[in-house]
Amino acid sequence: MASKATQGSIKEIQGDLFDAPDGAALIHACNCIGSWGGGIAKAFKQKYPAAYNIYHSHCQKYKFSPEYLVTSDPPNQPNNAQSSTRNKEIQLPEGTALIIPPQEKDYKDKDKKHWIICLFTSRNYGKRVSPPDVIIRNTELAVADMVRQIHRLRAEESGIGELWSCRFNSGLFGVEWVLSKRVLEESGLDFVVVRPVDEDE
């Protein structure tokens, strides 16, 4: 039976991302260096240390055995007749998503299990964070990769539940939320986006 494409939706609420229901997947943006040292990533590391170890090992794997994603960068200035499609090499895991299943060490003393989804949108962090245009391009690639993986996981009845997200990229990466939100809106999936109660719309 052929599946019909559905339009995704985003519901924005105020609260605590970590209050997501049992089985939910929590989405945040990550650097490719293996550090969850600041912002909401630091809270992820404290609450899900086993998931952090998987993320860190994933980054280290590509550090010592580099692999590259070849992607085309289509012209986005229609008034520029000289623009042409160019191929770009991106060093993994940049531009991809890592979906980490609930880890027993992270949920054994809690009443809820959470999946963790890492979107690799910046190569580095701090003063070496990627420029906003690169982060958004990586976000497009990473979200597309996440969507492919989620469709596969749901087909396998893996138990992955609702998709909950922070306003990723808008904190320490310094990218306006509206730009990342647009990428989610075009993904075809449904998301609950949580912002802290003290954060303005």
UniProtKB/Swiss-Prot annotation:
<keyword id="KW-0378">Hydrolase</keyword>
<comment type="function">
    <text>Highly specific phosphatase involved in the metabolism of ADP-ribose 1''-phosphate (Appr1p) which is produced as a consequence of tRNA splicing.</text>
</comment>
<dbReference type="InterPro" id="IPR050892">
    <property type="entry name" value="ADP-ribose_metab_enzymes"/>
</dbReference>
<dbReference type="Pfam" id="PF01661">
    <property type="entry name" value="Macro"/>
</dbReference>
<feature type="binding site">
    <location>
        <begin position="29"/>
        <end position="31"/>
    </location>
    <ligand>
        <name>substrate</name>
    </ligand>
</feature>
<dbReference type="InterPro" id="IPR043472">
    <property type="entry name" value="Macro_dom-like"/>
</dbReference>
<dbReference type="GO" id="GO:0140291">
    <property type="term" value="P:peptidyl-glutamate ADP-deribosylation"/>
</dbReference>
<feature type="binding site">
    <location>
        <begin position="36"/>
        <end position="41"/>
    </location>
    <ligand>
        <name>substrate</name>
    </ligand>
</feature>
<feature type="domain" description="Macro">
    <location>
        <begin position="1"/>
        <end position="201"/>
    </location>
</feature>
<dbReference type="InterPro" id="IPR002589">
    <property type="entry name" value="Macro_dom"/>
</dbReference>
<protein>
    <recommendedName>
        <fullName>ADP-ribose 1''-phosphate phosphatase</fullName>
        <ecNumber>3.1.3.84</ecNumber>
    </recommendedName>
</protein>
<comment type="similarity">
    <text>Belongs to the POA1 family.</text>
</comment>
<feature type="binding site">
    <location>
        <begin position="168"/>
        <end position="174"/>
    </location>
    <ligand>
        <name>substrate</name>
    </ligand>
</feature>
<keyword id="KW-0904">Protein phosphatase</keyword>
<dbReference type="GO" id="GO:0004721">
    <property type="term" value="F:phosphoprotein phosphatase activity"/>
</dbReference>
<feature type="binding site">
    <location>
        <begin position="15"/>
        <end position="17"/>
    </location>
    <ligand>
        <name>substrate</name>
    </ligand>
</feature>
